Amino acid sequence: MCETASTTLPPGITPISGDEARRLIHHTSGPELEALLDRAEAVRRAVHGDEVALCGITNAKSGRCPEDCGFCSQSARFEGADAPVYPMIGAGEIVEQAHKAERAGAREFSIVASGTRLAREQELATVEEALRRLRAETAVEPCASLGLMREPELRRLKDAGLMHYHHNLETARSHFENVCTTHTFDEQLETIRAAKGLGLKLCSGGILGMGETPEQRVEFAEEVRDLGVDCVPVNFLNPRAGTPLAHLKAITPEECLAALAVFRLMMPAAHIFVMGGREVNLGDRQDLIFRAGANGTMVGNYLTSAGRAPDLTVGMVERQGLTLRPPDTGKPWAFDGHAPSDADWNRKAAEPRPRPLPVVR
């Protein structure tokens, strides 16, 4: 899914400055917004062409997280949050979820686990086994999002077949303590730099709409840009009941689109993915994410909430005259051009789940 963020840019394409970004981030209506979207789309086409990549995930371990990230229903600290709670699923189920995502058009597949980090050797071993099987049995590019990681652990995962590591900054440094207090911004940077040092492709973004200012959205983008990440997943807050941020009002579709466009102009070479919250925040304007500069999005369900049916996501891409980008693993891709409908997807997903554990408060 992701190429290096140092991709050579076409003539005439240069990143905009932070000062210009802070001006443009306020262009959220009328001709100013239209011009901003046109500019972002032109950069996307010039650098990335007309291909869109899809990413699928599995929530491999859910709930009971000791962190206090204010947006997340998986925290054990929040009374009333109702995320599912279960231990690490088996490698076989992870691989089956990857097969489903691949058939739905996913280029990359990410193994996501709740918690500060993997707490047990057995969990790491399960992910290693799953990665080996993903490389052997599917065409998808394996990714993992497992919290804070050290170099030895990341090396084991890379040796097992990991291609991408995902770890979000979540928000600007100046706003981070308003969102999370149980780990630091710098701890997140350490994980990202460790992954980069091993040559893994980096996926790091965050969530917009968590009470930050427009200027802090630009600050966040500057920090992501300076890390030299390959992929920037952009989420929009979908407030979850029982969390500290549940009271926040969704930002407008125009604010979402302006932020995406500014991010594209700041980071022309990065792959920008629109992920969680697009249905809630953009509604019937979801198709405009590509005009705003995105060249990737998610297919299937999110961690703790349902996404669109895969055929609707693929249809959204095709309506814009865009095509799906296949994996770069050199293996035959299982996607045949026909993503499953909602009914088909739900029927295939109705498989036995691990027995839920009691929530620990």
Swiss-Prot record:
Its cofactor is [4Fe-4S] cluster; [2Fe-2S] cluster. Residues 47-278 form the Radical SAM core domain. It catalyses: (4R,5S)-dethiobiotin + (sulfur carrier)-SH + 2 reduced [2Fe-2S]-[ferredoxin] + 2 S-adenosyl-L-methionine = (sulfur carrier)-H + biotin + 2 5'-deoxyadenosine + 2 L-methionine + 2 oxidized [2Fe-2S]-[ferredoxin]. Residues 339-354 have a biased composition (Basic and acidic residues). Keywords: 2Fe-2S, 4Fe-4S, Biotin biosynthesis, Iron, Iron-sulfur, Metal-binding, S-adenosyl-L-methionine, Transferase. CDD domains: Radical_SAM (cd01335). One of its GO terms (biological process) is biotin biosynthetic process. GO terms for molecular function: 2 iron, 2 sulfur cluster binding; 4 iron, 4 sulfur cluster binding; biotin synthase activity; iron ion binding. Binds 1 [4Fe-4S] cluster. The cluster is coordinated with 3 cysteines and an exchangeable S-adenosyl-L-methionine. The keyword Transmembrane does not apply. The keyword Iron applies. InterPro entries: Aldolase_TIM (IPR013785), BATS_dom (IPR010722), Biotin_synth/BioAB (IPR002684), Biotin_synthase (IPR024177), Elp3/MiaA/NifB-like_rSAM (IPR006638), rSAM (IPR007197). SMART domains: BATS, Elp3. HAMAP family: BioB. Catalyzes the conversion of dethiobiotin (DTB) to biotin by the insertion of a sulfur atom into dethiobiotin via a radical-based mechanism. Belongs to the radical SAM superfamily. Biotin synthase family. Homodimer. This is Biotin synthase. It comes from Anaeromyxobacter sp. (strain K).
